[in-house]
Amino acid sequence: MPIKIPDQLPATEVLREENIFFMQESRATTQAIRPLKVIILNLMPKKIETETQFLRLLSNSPLQVDVELLRIDNRTSKNTPTEHLDTFYRQFEGIKDRNFDGLIITGAPLGLVQFEDVIYWDHLQTIMTWAKDHVTSSLYVCWAAQAGLKLLYDLPKRTRKEKLSGVYKHTNLDQHHPILRGFDDQFLAPHSRYADFSADYLKSHTDLDILATSKEAGVYLAATKDKRNVFVTGHPEYDSFTLHNEYVRDLGEGMEPTIPVNYYPDDNPDITPKATWRSHGHLLFSNWLNYCVYQQTPYDLEHFSEQNFTRDE
């Protein structure tokens, strides 16, 4: 949370240059606090596992967050009981007239499927378009990042020859960007995807701020200038065994997956893996909630509009 300082304090410029989060007194007196309303569109097959992973990260914040779960309308799930979906998940028709502070769209195992061949592609586009006028900040994760780039920038699907799987080192490219506050100069995060996110390609075809990259994995973190759209190409929400379970699954299906990079001790799948990205995941989601959502969203969501957004001091 920010420190509150007098409006004309000489230290203001120094604090701003050092990326210290502060709020001037005139703004602090007008900032009211209420629970943030965040909705998660869960596209993953194992919905209970995925919702647990994201809720874990959203919980590590001093802000109160009211979370709702969203499903693709009338889609049955092979891996999640119908009664769970009916009890805990909303359908788009039921929420389309409401506004939210944040939207998270999860990944989906559709790396080798063309967008137009995704059964729910039209419905997903409808939700992403709706978010422009109903959500303060949207967070697109892994496959959803690729889908979001297609919708917002009409970028074609770019696919790697081999699946990227493992835990990779990333470089913090802008220590003064709010999303990266508190990040180490280099940090680890897991990836599990076929999508290719080249930094040069995104720089030449979008106006995104490229915030973190990896030599092996390409762009990991990017955002629009107004922070209303944030793209995470990896899986910071994964728990310790998610990559292992995917590896075992692929082996069981007769595939020949490579051992996830930098994941198992001594690259030995028989040794219990360790999560080396947990603190990064918590900090990323905490920063998104604070700087992209809470600091920008209007207090009264019923009067949501572009003009309502507050800006960094």
From Swiss-Prot:
Q: Where is this site: Important for substrate specificity?
A: 192
GO terms of molecular function: homoserine O-acetyltransferase activity; homoserine O-succinyltransferase activity
Name the catalytic site residues: 142 (acyl-thioester intermediate), 235 (proton acceptor), 237
CDD domains linked to this entry: GATase1_HTS (cd03131)
The answer to whether the entry has keyword Protease is no
Question: Could you tell me the superkingdom of the organism this chain comes from?
Answer: Bacteria
Task: Name the pathway it acts in.
Answer: Amino-acid biosynthesis; L-methionine biosynthesis via de novo pathway; O-succinyl-L-homoserine from L-homoserine: step 1/1
Q: Give the GO biological process terms.
A: L-methionine biosynthetic process from homoserine via O-succinyl-L-homoserine and cystathionine
Q: What is its EC number?
A: 2.3.1.46
**UniProt-recorded name of the protein:** Homoserine O-succinyltransferase
User: What organism is listed for this UniProt entry?
Assistant: Aliivibrio fischeri (strain MJ11)
